[in-house]
């Protein structure tokens, strides 16, 4: 057993992060003291266990059965939990706002979480198009269990090569429409064959990534913006076509009604360069409020 520790940029309330993740995926994260996820590190499937061991300053412990690769284990753990995201500049901007200032105080230390790979994030961006997150989660679970690897009771997301070898008909049995199955298989081809180098993305500008993604069949403006804000941690990006975001921004920052995409961006403009983070906090506040009320 390998035991490591990391120090995220504070504030970082890991239990609050798990509570938020649970509100989006009911049934998961019942134990709010530890996060378990199956990942692949240098082609070795393993399970990471991450728990907070100190709040101020924040410190987290990582456990895994993988004996080596300490630097890669730490890097991947930091990536998944947004350990290097500094919330303080956003909090300073939000503090003067009567609604978001209150929400950021209540959710102090909340950060998003993301999948272990950008390829998985691309598949998420495809599966979540125009359906509920719950339905998309069920579809992805079937994809993972059909094409992934099982390790210590959890499933590792399938590799691009594995999904490239799948058939559209088989992918459709997981719940995907024919078109989405073609999109997933197409993206897997692009990545597995080296035509789409995801390793370049972190060094690229927002606009360069967006334009590149829009050239890929099945990835439109919503998917590109969602990939940027969640997958690449670009905190000013907003998938403003998203009905949920348009509704929650209208409810808390507007007159209570769903806004247009342009109206959504206008209302969030006060929080530049953290518009995406502002939208995330509004969504998290609403989801957690509903979860606890229910």
PLM regions and their residue ranges:
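HhH-family (HhH-GPD) DNA N-glycosylase catalytic core used in base-excision repair
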Residues: 1-294
